[in-house]
Regions:
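Glycine-rich beta-strand-to-loop/alpha-helix junction loops that act as flexible
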Residues: 51-54
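Catalytic core of pol beta-like nucleotidyltransferases
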Residues: 1-45, 57-63, 73-123
Length: 123
């Protein structure tokens, strides 16, 4: 039985380390997402930036996760330039979704996200 107890303790330690690493990666991704927001707003003049997906889930951001960002107001001709620019600034893959082009199923996932930026209407 001693071998099983030692194995269990070792496995629990490994799981705690993995969970801590995942949370650290998630915190880094959230910080990077703020910088990506700034690029999208300042360089590409988008009117709205929404963070969604696994990065918002406390235990959902794993080693294979990306940063999911939806935007409104991105010129179609600027899409690939924006993706390239974001990828250069991020150690994580970035999945950029123009709201004007997404399917309803994706829209529902985006609706559960967090707005990082919304252009104020001028009065």
């Amino acid at each position: 039985m001693a071998n099983i107890a030692a194995y269990k303790k070792g496995w629990e330690r490994t799981l705690r380390r993995e969970k801590a690493l995942q949370e650290k990666r998630r915190a880094e991704a959230l910080k990077i997402a703020e910088g990506l927001r700034d690029i999208l707003v300042q360089e590409f003049k988008v009117s709205r930036v929404i963070l969604f997906g696994s990065v918002l889930k406390k235990h959902g951001f794993d080693m294979d996760s990306d940063i999911d960002i939806a935007v409104e107001g991105l010129a179609k001709k600027s899409y690939f330039k924006a993706v390239a620019r974001l990828m250069m600034q991020s150690q994580f893959p970035v999945d950029l979704k123009p709201m004007e082009d997404v399917r309803e199923s994706v829209r529902k996932r985006i609706a559960k996200g967090v707005a990082l930026y919304e252009e104020r209407a001028s009065s």
